[in-house]
Amino acid sequence: MAENTNNSAVTETEETTAAFTTETNSGAGTGTSTIAPGYGTGRRKEAVARVRLVPGTGEWKINGRTLEEYFPSKLLQREVNSPIVLLKLEGKFDAIVLVDGGGTTGQAGAIRLGVARALNAIDRDANRAALKKAGFLTRDARVVERKKAGLHKARRAPQFSKR
């Protein structure tokens, strides 16, 4: 019984591999990037996003909710979707995202980096140059500056009185 299970698992993986092959028949190199599954991790401030892109219809699932439910702001929706729009791949991938920590802006930035890294992993030759030029593969290193002792905030000092 165990042999049959292993054989069926091998058959399924062979079919899956065949469905996502990168080989083309004619006109190789003339089309856009390959449609295959990919994974990327993005970080921004305190937020961490784990992004899976699978061939599909352009549906977003962020922590089990749609893009519009999770990010009501059109600005954040546009930011998250910008790497896909840049490469003209709208409607070709479904995004499954798990994002944790930070606020909405940090999470949107983390998802954008994760999506860009996933697209880079899918087809490095076709996608990397455009993503790099737009700055989507660069991690935004800006984080909140820590509070210092003797100050009210990171840099705000107590009011000075000459006398």
Curated annotation (Swiss-Prot):
Comp. bias intervals (Low complexity): 1-25
| InterPro entries attached to this UniProt entry | Ribosomal_Su5_D2-typ_SF, Ribosomal_uS9, Ribosomal_uS9_bac/plastid, Ribosomal_uS9_CS, Ribsml_uS5_D2-typ_fold_subgr
- Coiled coil start-end: none
One Pfam match: Ribosomal_S9
**Region Disordered: what ranges?**
1-40
Q: Which GO biological-process labels does this protein carry?
A: translation
Record-linked PROSITE patterns? RIBOSOMAL_S9
For the keyword Hydrolase, the answer is no
Keywords of the record, alphabetical order, are: Ribonucleoprotein, Ribosomal protein
Q: Which GO terms describe its cellular component?
A: cytoplasm; small ribosomal subunit
Q: GO molecular-function annotation terms?
A: RNA binding; structural constituent of ribosome
Q: Which family would the database say this protein is a member of? A: Belongs to the universal ribosomal protein uS9 family.
| Protein known as | Small ribosomal subunit protein uS9
Q: What is the lineage of its organism?
A: Bacteria, Bacillati, Actinomycetota, Actinomycetes, Bifidobacteriales
